[in-house]
Amino acid sequence: MTDEQIKELFDTVPAFADSCIESLRPAPFLRSISRCLSASVNTGLIYGTVNPNYPGMTWRELLDKGEKMRKNIRLFTVNPEYYLNLERFRAPFMSFCFHEGKGYVAEDGCHRACIAKFFLYSQPSPFLCGVHFTEVQTDARMTNLFYRLKKLLPVWCAAFPNSQEVTRNDDAKEWSMSFYRNTLRIENHHRKGFNADFQAEELEEGLLPALLNPFKRRFGMYRNLLN
């Protein structure tokens, strides 16, 4: 879609128009997940989508070539107020997931989210109201340890992340929050039955030093797991 066509629809060409749409990559370790059935999201913080068809495209290209875009643009030209209203629940519903501050279109609403980004860019407020909202906080400490260990472990050992929900607050009618406990499972494929689950402290103070020290690796307390 040309600059002139975008200006005709939205009065301006936003700075993000030629930025690539990002894909949502699931985090190996979670700290918490909060969910809200009716929230407002800043469309300026929407960077991508879980839809596998669009990452790598620019927002301009999605506006031009999206599967349902012509229909949604036609509806927008008839009723732009749809993107400005303060309805408690937007219909059809739209769903967004935020990972560490970056937003992604989740289950539904990719084409409308694209239109909202362009339209609300020049409006007094960039917020889209009445949408489903999920916010994910990840465990950066365990994630960093996981990727370090993958480089250091012998080829016959494998590392598997595990995030287990330990508490959930879902007493409220329209929102809930879950908290997670994280461990890293190491399995030795040469020795059946030799595996172990580690929390961050033992990884930092025990397993990593053993992997970095040839003597500890061969004769230390983790010798059956690592050899």
Show which residues each predicted segment covers.
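Charged/polar, solvent-exposed surface patches and flexible loops
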Residues: 75, 118, 151
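A short, basic-hydrophobic beta/loop patch
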Residues: 88-148
